[in-house]
């Protein structure tokens, strides 16, 4: 078979095959590294058991919650596999967007998205980031095809995956008014907006019914140290080599200036670059407001790639920058050093303390391998916890913090219980005092004293005992 001819003739099959080859090995070993993934699985199991809607976390992610509640006891590789399929859909739709815009080498642009470390990893575990992006890419393509009602439906589904997808509305409005008269743009906006509003209202109706308007509430989190904010917004998104590639690409644009030969695209889609800039800017600002996770920047990635592709696709250096992006998931990473929840380092890793946290610069293992070893380490810790938990023979409270969802799901799956022990993510001063008055001993897992102070402004330093060293 002529591979070059096959790639040219069947680009979507190339995306499907590469998605399967690169994702399948990572669908096992639990539902991911995020506690939210395990909380989601527990939530959909309760929805299936009770028939009553429940949020996995505020403000609700009803598309994923309701779909997964139809397969609540599916093994990890099945639920993770759905994320793989939605990641595949997002990549295919981005390819179709780039092709619709008449950009050269649209498959290359799609592969850059596929191999972005944060996107790659998020398409291998049970979480909603790539689900939302898949529907956003569908909405974008449908918008370019002037299918306004379907654009609205796809946008509503994206918001039903992640409510922050509503940011897509701002560049959408600008795009419509740039490409048509105010009268036509207003009509098109109505055709998009009505189904989007109806779909969003329908999807969030269960949350509104059960929780009232309070379903939007979440407790405030402290702002992370600036080095961590920078890391999560750069290396955490693109990997080490991806950051090198982005810096090189931006410097090329800066120094080449007017000598650049931007791609020639379809003039019927004016305002696309402004569309991309707005999407990037809004998601960067949103991330800076609450820089908790690198994955919050996933919706900006297709638009960043579009801008790079637009200005650099005809530059000789672009092939080199693309090569760095494509290897970024597999080689070199900067990771947390922690025996229970950190990654396993290679022999060539170098450790350094940054902002009070020990981190490892690993010259061999890339982000996807490091993420896999984190998942395995967390599984080992939960197994170690359960072994110790089963041996407790006195009345005890264990504050589990961010480990709670991992532990609860594992115990539920293995039908493990100890009537002597109360497990909780955290407790207020009043709750702890009540248990102490009933002769309960207070234990906690490492680092969870910080969690309890953040959420409840209290931790019993003098009475609490570390459960596992």
Q: Which residue stretches match the model-derived regions?
A:
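Short acidic/glycine- and proline-prone juxtamembrane loop motifs at membrane-interface regions
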Residues: 35, 121-129, 293-294
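Transmembrane-helix motifs of polytopic, lipid-linked glycan transferases
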Residues: 13, 17, 77-101, 138, ...
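Membrane-interface transmembrane helices that cradle and orient dolichyl/undecaprenyl
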Residues: 99-100, 137-150, 312
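Hydrophobic/aromatic-rich transmembrane helices and adjacent perimembrane loops
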Residues: 161, 167, 289-317
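Extracytoplasmic catalytic/substrate-binding loops of multi-pass membrane glycan-assembly enzymes
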Residues: 29-43, 54-67, 77, 378
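Membrane-lumen/periplasm interface segments of specific transmembrane helices
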Residues: 187-252, 284, 288, 328-338
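Loop-to-helix entry region of an early transmembrane alpha helix in multi-pass inner-membrane enzymes
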Residues: 58-62, 66, 73-92, 122
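Membrane-embedded, lumen/periplasm-facing catalytic core of multi-pass transferases
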Residues: 40, 324-406, 410
